[in-house]
């Protein structure tokens, strides 16, 4: 038997409407509205929100987003016609917030813009000012001199063709730093670019510091962010590795310490 406290508990839930993402949610039909009305009558349940998700709001044409918005409003009308009033209605993701404020309704769901990043290259960047807030840093773990003929990292994909100074950075794909950056990406040390040499390992990768004077163990390494006049952006990392900025923001693993700064 349920206790008195359990009988008095109220579950607050939200109803998802599928208007075009074809992921999860009720379809926009009379039958779906009937089911939602039945849910609203269940004891100990309060429907506090109803929402949908834009599939193409980050595209140049906003017609698909407005088609979804119209479907969403139609579903709300069907539900309200059955006597169900849902207080919070929302559908705007980051692209919607920036470009179609008329769809913002009672609440919005900012995602990538919280990082100061753009949802896509098709979004009008003149509408809002964004500043990237996420950076990724490490320190030089080892420095060595290599002569011509040596091969660096797994598979020997980088061959030393002249005398080089190589620094090891203790970060790898185990931290979410993409292996796709092997022999393509670079980091910043003392405000200068240090190209990645060879494959990114699970926990380490190597960079060329031949032209950066006096690099030593413990020197700061910027993998994402600004150092002096140079900057590495999430978009650059994504383009080089065949990923996109959302993935890089999500793939940094829990073993990487987070430091949060106010203001």
What is the predicted function of each stretch?
Residues 1-11:
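Single conserved hydrophobic/aromatic residue that forms the stacking wall/gate
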